[in-house]
A protein has these predicted regions:
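N-terminal signal peptide c-region/cleavage motif recognized by signal peptidases
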Residues: 18-20
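Bacterial N-terminal signal peptides
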Residues: 7-16
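N-terminal secretory signal peptides that target proteins for export/translocation
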Residues: 1-3
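Amphipathic, charged alpha-helical segments and their helix-to-coil junctions
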Residues: 24-40, 45-58, 86-125
């Protein structure tokens, strides 16, 4: 049953990434991501790498609020907690990072994606 639930979470999380996509098309967000100022966290949310400016904090907060709303809806639809669903989404977002983008490693440090697979949390499905 756990494997089935995890499979459902993975499938559902794959669909959710498009949900906050409009906010993530913001040129300021794209510039921050390309500059390594923001990165994907294993908890499913966007994080600030280094010093935060008010504008960068606003962008990250806006995206994370939208992500949380999607996670809440999808978690309820899939009989999971928001945290379970968000982590599954975070694992997938980290797996999809492009070379040069930042992500949070399992130890909490920020890494820059290389051509090798990213370090993933052992709890990732």
């Amino acid at each position: 049953m756990k494997i089935f639930r995890d499979s459902l979470l993975v499938a559902a999380a794959a669909m959710l990434i498009a949900a906050p996509a409009a906010a993530e098309r913001d040129p300021a967000y794209a510039a921050a991501r390309a500059a390594g100022k923001v990165g994907e966290k294993v908890d499913g949310y966007l994080g600030i790498v280094g010093a935060a400016t008010p504008e960068l904090q606003r962008i990250v907060d806006d995206i994370n609020i939208k992500r949380r709303a999607v996670y809440a809806r999808k978690a309820q639809e899939n009989n999971a907690t928001i945290e379970q669903y968000a982590m599954t989404a975070g694992c997938q977002a980290i797996a999809r990072t492009a070379v040069g983008e930042k992500y949070q490693a399992p130890d909490g440090s920020w890494k820059t994606r290389t051509s090798a697979p990213p370090e993933r949390d052992p709890r990732c499905p």
